[in-house]
């Protein structure tokens, strides 16, 4: 039995790095929290669509035809990837009518989105993953802080802002620290703030979640 367990653990360690496990755990936790908050008909925002995985999850949660997903990214390739991801995986084509994708910096939001009208805003910071992506194009701490400040004005009661911070690349650790500084200053009577951080893995991703009371 012990030999089988060791063999299984060795196989497990070859397949997954600890950083990868932390990332997958955070993604699962993030989606669980979002799924508990979002209801049919809500407005949600994916502020940095990347490869489209969060946008796909949000689109699936928005059952019915009255909800709305806004998705943004600074790179056209990310918008194209996300649109393709949604078209290939959504069960019905008419769900695309609920989706608005556009190329823009995440630090500002369209004026049509009214204050206190959004149930969830999702961030996946850093650069666009993939072997062919330009790793020099990434989110910047100053833009992210401005974006989060604006996002907090949009979130409705009972809503959630989630920020996945990646600390392993150049500038990532500093960006994560700036995010946590902003969140730590929020009024506890209005907000519940959590940092989900593997304490013994300083370069692993950290998930920051902010709930509007």
Label each PLM-derived region with a short phrase:
Residues 122-147:
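Mobile active-site "lid"/loop adjacent to the S-adenosyl-L-methionine
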Residues 68-73:
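Conserved SAM-binding motif I beta-strand of class I
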Residues 147, 154, 158-165:
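Conserved beta-strand signature within the Rossmann-like core of class I S-adenosyl-L-methionine
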Residues 2-43, 47-61, 80-116:
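S-adenosyl-L-methionine
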Residues 39, 63-64, 155-157:
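Helix-to-beta-strand junctions that scaffold the AdoMet/dcAdoMet cofactor pocket
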Residues 42, 67, 159:
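Glycine-centered, small-residue-biased loops immediately flanking beta-strands
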Residues 169-213:
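Class I S-adenosyl-L-methionine
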């Amino acid at each position: 039995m012990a030999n089988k367990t060791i063999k299984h653990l060795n196989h497990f360690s070859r397949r997954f790095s600890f950083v990868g496990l932390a990332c997958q755990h955070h993604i699962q936790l993030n989606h669980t929290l979002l799924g508990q908050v979002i209801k049919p008909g809500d407005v949600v925002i994916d502020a940095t669509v990347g490869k489209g995985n969060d946008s796909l999850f949000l689109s699936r949660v928005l059952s019915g035809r009255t909800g709305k997903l806004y998705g943004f990214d600074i790179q056209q390739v990310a918008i194209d990837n996300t649109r393709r991801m949604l078209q290939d995986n959504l069960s019905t084509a008419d769900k695309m009518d609920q989706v608005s994708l556009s190329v823009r910096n995440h630090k500002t939001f369209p004026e049509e989105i009214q204050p206190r009208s959004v149930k969830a805003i999702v961030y996946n910071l850093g650069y666009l993953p993939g072997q062919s992506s330009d790793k020099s194009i990434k989110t910047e701490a100053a833009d992210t802080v401005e974006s989060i400040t604006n996002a907090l004005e949009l979130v409705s009661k009972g809503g959630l802002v989630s920020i996945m911070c990646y600390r392993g690349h150049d500038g990532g650790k500093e960006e994560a620290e700036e995010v946590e500084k902003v969140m730590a200053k929020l009024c506890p009577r209005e907000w519940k703030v959590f940092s989900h951080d593997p304490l013994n893995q300083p370069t692993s991703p950290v998930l920051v979640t902010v709930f509007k009371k």
